[in-house]
Curated annotation (Swiss-Prot):
Keyword Transmembrane helix set for record: yes
Mode of membrane association: Single-pass membrane protein
Keywords carried by this UniProt record: Membrane, Transmembrane, Transmembrane helix
Name of the protein in question: Uncharacterized protein C1F3.08c
Domain of life: Eukaryota
Protein's cellular compartments: Membrane
Transmembrane segments: 64-84
A cellular component annotation (GO) from this entry: membrane
Organism: Schizosaccharomyces pombe (strain 972 / ATCC 24843)
Length: 108
């Protein structure tokens, strides 16, 4: 499942209990990540142990590594581990803003 929302919608989610509830529900899944097609790329990876890296404190060089690392995993492992049929490229996002993706593994 992939969920998209613009930055204002995401900011609203971050400030509500709905987002916290979503994170509690998603801790059992493979990855929950926030990515952006804006010049400043931010990423929030959530792992099984629910360790969260604050998106305001991630350096750009690590952000780019994280983005490419997840794309590598999706390309190489998606046929076996991820029930994602199609990943929507960032440039197809009409809002040209933050993209919120939830990648859920059926193996969870």
């Amino acid at each position: 499942m992939v969920i998209y929302c613009n930055w204002l919608e995401l900011k609203g989610l971050l400030e509500t209990n709905d987002f916290l509830y979503l994170m509690r529900c998603c801790y059992m899944y493979d990855t929950v990540s926030l990515v952006s097609n804006a010049p400043n790329i931010y990423s929030i990876p959530f792992f099984y142990d629910r360790i969260c890296y604050d998106y305001k404190n991630i350096l750009l060089k690590y952000e780019l590594f994280i983005i490419y690392y997840y794309y590598y995993l999706l390309i190489c492992l998606s046929p076996h581990f991820f029930p994602i049929k199609r990943i929507r490229p960032f440039h197809e996002n009409p809002l040209h803003s933050f993209v919120y993706r939830i990648m859920i593994s059926s193996e969870a």
